[in-house]
C-alpha cells in the first residue's frame, strides 16, 4: 500500500487491477510463511515448555498437520498463479521475483536447513518484505524505480525485520535449547540490542531524508 501510494504521489499513476494482484501476492507470501512456520515447529517437535508467545495452531491440534500441508500447497499454487498475472503485467523479471519469494516464504521453516534456524531471518525479511515487495509494487505501477522507492523499501523492510528480531529475542533461550542459531542467539544480548536499535532508527532517519528531498 505504501509503495502504491508513493507511485501515485510521484507519478500520478495507479492501476487498480495491478494493485489488486500486487497486494494479493504480498498477502499470500505472508500467510505461507506464517503457516509453514507453525507447521515446521510441530513437524520438528521444536516446541518446549520454556517457549514464550502465542500457542501454535498445529501444536495445539487446532489444525491437523495434513490439513496444514494441504492449505500451504493450495496457497503456493495460488501464489504461482498470481505470479503468472504479474509476469503478464510487468514482464518476465517477475517470474524470478515471484518464484524466489515463494521459495523464501516456504524455506523460512521448511527444507533441510530452514532460514529460521540461521542468523539470516532478519536479512531475508528485509530483502523480500522490504526491497522486493516495495520496489516490485512501485515498478508494476510506473515501470521504473525511484530513489524514494528504494528508501521506502529499506524503511519498511527494517520495520518488518525489527518485528522478527523482537520475536527472536523473546525466544532466544528456547531457540538456543533446540539448536536454532538465530541472530539473537549468535550475537548475544548486548550486540543484538545495538543492531535492533539500528533497525528501529533507520526508518525514521530515511523518512527524514525522503521528507527533505526536493
Positions of predicted regions on the chain:
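Short, hydrophobic transmembrane alpha-helix segments
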Residues: 3-18, 212
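Membrane-embedded alpha-helical segments that form the functional core of polytopic membrane enzymes
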Residues: 12-36, 95-104, 146-166
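Hydrophobic residues within the alpha-helical transmembrane core of Major Facilitator Superfamily
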Residues: 2, 84, 103-106, 136, ...
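Multi-pass membrane catalytic core of lipid/isoprenoid biosynthesis enzymes
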Residues: 49-89, 180-214
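Intramembrane alpha-helical segments
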Residues: 56-144
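Acidic (Asp/Glu-rich) catalytic motifs at the cytosolic membrane interface
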Residues: 28-52, 162-184
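Small-residue-rich segments of transmembrane alpha-helices in multi-pass membrane proteins
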Residues: 1-4, 123-138, 156, 184-189
Amino acid at each position: 500500500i505504501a509503495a502504491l501510494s508513493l507511485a501515485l504521489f510521484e507519478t500520478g499513476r495507479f492501476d487498480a487491477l495491478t494493485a489488486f494482484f500486487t497486494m494479493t501476492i504480498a498477502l499470500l507470501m505472508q500467510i505461507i510463511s506464517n503457516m509453514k512456520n507453525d507447521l515446521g515447529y510441530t513437524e520438528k517437535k521444536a516446541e518446549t515448555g520454556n517457549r514464550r508467545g502465542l500457542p501454535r495452531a498445529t501444536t495445539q491440534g487446532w489444525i491437523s498437520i495434513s490439513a496444514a500441508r494441504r492449505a500451504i500447497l493450495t496457497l503456493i499454487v495460488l501464489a504461482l498463479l498470481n505470479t503468472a498475472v504479474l509476469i503478464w503485467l510487468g514482464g518476465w523479471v517477475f517470474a524470478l521475483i515471484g518464484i524466489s519469494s515463494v521459495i523464501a516464504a516456504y524455506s523460512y521453516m521448511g527444507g533441510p536447513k530452514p532460514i529460521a534456524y540461521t542468523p539470516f531471518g532478519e536479512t531475508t525479511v528485509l530483502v523480500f518484505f522490504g526491497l522486493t515487495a516495495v520496489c516490485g509494487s512501485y515498478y508494476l505501477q510506473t515501470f521504473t524505480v525511484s530513489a524514494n522507492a528504494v528508501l521506502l523499501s529499506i524503511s519498511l523492510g527494517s520495520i518488518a525485520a525489527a518485528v522478527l528480531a523482537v520475536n527472536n529475542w523473546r525466544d532466544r533461550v528456547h531457540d538456543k535449547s533446540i539448536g536454532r542459531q538465530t541472530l539473537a542467539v549468535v550475537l548475544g544480548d548486548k550486540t543484538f540490542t545495538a543492531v535492533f536499535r539500528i533497525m528501529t532508527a533507520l526508518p525514521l532517519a530515511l523518512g527524514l531524508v525522503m521528507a527533505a528531498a526536493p
